[in-house]
């Protein structure tokens, strides 16, 4: 294994050359309490918590049957209150503390077909055809007609939060605005999760999504 900087150059001094099994997804970097933590989950159910040199910073005491959901870090007021959240293959939430233990006092059971993300202080949960968002700016419950939903993405544009998600079966792209309203005119045609951005830096928001054969669609958001 190698660590690269933002320019694609290998970082010297990286100690971890090989894991005991295949990495499930790319390593993720978090800063907690001013210290670097690099998380790397393996097929053999091992969670590596490393420092920026690739050395073990925290040894996790138990094995975890990782699902396809990426690891999330929920930051508390202190390191002791901060936890790594993993959803295992049975749909159970595993709360890994930064002393290497797993806190089983807080347990949530989800459907195995779950997508969970924690971003911008918001919990985003997709179970089947249901979307649930909970956080400081957005609190949203929405049920779609199908379970064929893309991963949801949260954006902060012009000091407002927007969430995009796409029903890939019907090719309908949805855009929600804080706290819980669908943007007027949506859903629109699209096959991929859209991006909300002020493309021209003119205070007007664009919504970009792709259709068949990679064709891009640029919608104006009212």
Language-model features, listed with the residues they occupy:
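Acidic, glycine-anchored loop motifs typical of Ca2+
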Residues: 32-37, 75-83, 118-125, 156-162, ...
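Eukaryotic tandem repeat interaction scaffolds
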Residues: 62, 83-156
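Blade-level signature of beta-propeller repeat domains, shared across WD40, Kelch, NHL, RCC1
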Residues: 194-222
């Amino acid at each position: 294994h190698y660590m690269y900087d933002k320019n694609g150059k290998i970082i010297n001094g990286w100690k971890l050359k090989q894991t005991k099994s295949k990495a499930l997804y790319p390593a993720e970097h978090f800063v907690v309490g001013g210290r670097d933590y690099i998380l790397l989950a393996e097929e053999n159910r091992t969670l590596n918590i490393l420092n920026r040199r690739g050395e073990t910073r925290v040894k996790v005491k138990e094995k975890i049957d990782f699902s396809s959901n990426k690891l999330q870090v929920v930051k508390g007021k202190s390191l002791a209150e901060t936890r790594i959240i993993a959803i295992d293959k049975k749909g159970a939430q595993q709360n890994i503390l930064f002393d290497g233990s797993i806190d089983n006092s807080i347990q949530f059971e989800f459907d195995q077909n779950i997508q969970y993300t924690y971003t911008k202080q918001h919990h985003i949960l997709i179970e089947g055809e249901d979307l649930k968002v909970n956080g400081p700016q957005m609190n949203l419950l929405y049920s779609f007609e199908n379970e064929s939903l893309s991963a949801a993405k949260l954006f902060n544009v012009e000091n407002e939060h927007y969430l995009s998600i796409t029903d890939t079966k019907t090719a309908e792209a949805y855009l929600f605005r804080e706290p819980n309203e669908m943007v007027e005119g949506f859903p629109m045609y699209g096959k991929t999760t859209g991006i909300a951005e002020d493309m021209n830096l003119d205070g007007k928001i664009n919504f970009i999504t792709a259709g068949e054969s990679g064709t891009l669609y640029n919608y104006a958001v009212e």
